């Protein structure tokens, strides 16, 4: 397959995700397919966003990394220190993605590292590993193209997250401001009772302890639920299960006091 054909393969996959969040697992699989490599797509802080590995590469250490969805902090630091593409790294180098405990198996292995940039900042790293063959100039062109596209997608997701957080914050504050003084007091005591973002509430118990009516608690919960801030589910005599849906809610509630 020519370099142009491989580039088009990557483009075709990304076009399918236009307007929606990219599945980095799919992208890793496609990069692996067109470059014939083992692939890690890693965030700036070491989170594994996507990967595609053959069985040979897997070891106890690699399996643990995949389970944790995170690479070791020492390796993350080494990756971040790489400012431009470094190719054909051998097994004895600390930057090799291959497990050193299996050195004899991967004696001819090669690792290539592509920094992922976007908006003038480091967003992550694309790590490719081959068991034997060297990376060619065409491989490097394709890898750098993939890293550029990944940077654009990660940056777009970051912007989407910021926008969503702003919308959530606005919805939370509107919900809090809609509460009466007694309802806000009830909500504060409810989450003090729960001791976290979810748990089982016995409304009558809180009402008796705080000295408010049960209807105040019910009204307060209803307002928050209708605003999409929490969800609740009646468990009959056991009480009501409550869970915060918007992560910033408890912080904003505390700030509003």
UniProtKB/Swiss-Prot annotation:
User: Which one Pfam family would you cite for this protein?
Assistant: HTH_CodY
InterPro entries in UniProt: CodY, GAF-like_dom_sf, GTP_trans_reg_CodY_C, Transc_reg_CodY_N, WH-like_DNA-bd_sf, WH_DNA-bd_sf
GO CC terms? cytoplasm
> Per its UniProt record, what Gene3D superfamilies does this chain match?
3.30.450.40, Winged helix-like DNA-binding domain superfamily/Winged helix DNA-binding domain
Q: Which residues form the signal peptide?
A: none
The alphabetized list of GO BP terms reads: negative regulation of DNA-templated transcription
Region (GAF domain) residue ranges read: 1-155
Question: What is the protein's major site of localization?
Answer: cytoplasm
Where in or outside the cell is it found? Cytoplasm
Q: Mind listing the GO molecular function terms for this protein?
A: DNA binding; DNA-binding transcription factor activity; GTP binding
**This protein's UniProt keywords:** Cytoplasm, DNA-binding, Repressor, Transcription, Transcription regulation
Q: Residues annotated as DNA-binding region?
A: 203-222
Q: What does this protein do?
A: DNA-binding global transcriptional regulator which is involved in the adaptive response to starvation and acts by directly or indirectly controlling the expression of numerous genes in response to nutrient availability. During rapid exponential growth, CodY is highly active and represses genes whose products allow adaptation to nutrient depletion.
- Its family? Belongs to the CodY family.
What is the recorded name of this protein? Global transcriptional regulator CodY
The organism is Staphylococcus carnosus (strain TM300)
What is this protein's gene name? codY
